[in-house]
């Protein structure tokens, strides 16, 4: 049965092979089960795209998740959301033709800047809020908003911010959301408490991002996930001196309304956009780059170390899986239709989330 059974009426199924329409160039990234290529249109010379190539063998049993991501991306046409242009379902691979974004990750750009102000942070968060408000108006919850998924469109100094990676996104019409997902440190209390949740989880994540943008370090941190989650559930964070002494009370008030433990009392995207720190002129304009950049560099170094550690752990788990008696039994006899070899969760997570 074809992978893409239903298509957006505005997005007809391509009738040709992807390589008839695009020239594949450099590999931009490699994940556990996919690669992203730089591709140029053959009909519009010079027009470049990012093409995600997904191995169908690795996709088996997870088609519904990919279809959900594609369904979401087709719904969302916004200046601050990475666009999906076409999909190709071919014999061995599924291809997603995406908008090419070349400006780099949010934190990397801030560290590289010569100056950076609270007003700059306000402008960044405004763009994120506008895009997420658009998602919410269209019944979509992102569920994994974090700095790694906020990219600059290009290298221009005034480049816009783009939201990417909709692998964990969900539409409200697909049923009650109660699955624990997201990224530790950015996930909302109600998700950790395994309560039904909705759009408010995205607002919490934006609050965490805003906090980091103003000081360079996260509001919640512990080496132990259990302790980290306990902090988040209780909403235990501080505006520490001396780092927050140079930040406006308006910014602190704004963050407090986004990181409110009660989702019913938490700001919506629209109410956040109306707050003076976003819509007015209460954001300070003095340079905070030095303080923020110092902490961001430490956070980036730690994140990159964890990324390398998790990749190594995934490889070790896969090697153990291949050597295990269960895996050997599966290789030595054909499983019946009710048997399925389960890959380690970390591998599945790496595939459905952003390519490391």
UniProtKB/Swiss-Prot annotation:
Family the UniProt entry places it in = Belongs to the protein kinase superfamily. CAMK Ser/Thr protein kinase family. CaMK subfamily.
Q: Which Pfam families match?
A: Pkinase
**Any keyword Nucleus?**
yes
Q: Name one GO molecular function term.
A: calmodulin binding
What cofactor does its activity depend on? Mg(2+)
Known regulation of activity: Activated by Ca(2+)/calmodulin. Binding of calmodulin results in a conformational change that generates functional binding sites for both substrate and ATP, and thus relieves autoinhibition and lowers the Km of substrate binding. Must be phosphorylated by ckk-1 to be maximally active but this does not appear to be required for activity in AFD neurons.
User: Which keywords does this chain's UniProt record carry?
Assistant: Allosteric enzyme, ATP-binding, Calmodulin-binding, Cytoplasm, Developmental protein, Kinase, Magnesium, Metal-binding, Nucleotide-binding, Nucleus, Phosphoprotein, Serine/threonine-protein kinase, Transferase
Region: Calmodulin-binding; residue ranges are 298-319
Cysteine pairings via disulfide bonds? none
Q: Where is the active site?
A: 144
Q: What is this protein called?
A: Calcium/calmodulin-dependent protein kinase type 1
UniProt-annotated location(s): Nucleus; Cytoplasm
So what does this one do? Calcium/calmodulin-dependent protein kinase that operates in the calcium-triggered CaMKK-CaMK1 signaling cascade which results in transcriptional activation. Transcriptional activation occurs at least in part through phosphorylation of crh-1. Regulates gene expression, sensory morphology, and function of the AFD thermosensory neurons. Involved in long-term adaptation of AFD neurons to temperatures warmer than the initial acclimatized cultivation temperature.
Q: Which gene encodes it?
A: cmk-1
Positions of post-translational Phosphothreonine modification:
179
Species of the source: Caenorhabditis briggsae
Q: What is its main location?
A: nucleus
The UniProt entry annotates the motif Nuclear localization signal at: 2-7
Binding sites annotated in the UniProt record for ATP: 28-36, 52
Among CDD domains, the record links this protein to: STKc_CaMKI
Task: Report which reactions are catalysed by this protein.
Answer: L-seryl-[protein] + ATP = O-phospho-L-seryl-[protein] + ADP + H(+); L-threonyl-[protein] + ATP = O-phospho-L-threonyl-[protein] + ADP + H(+)
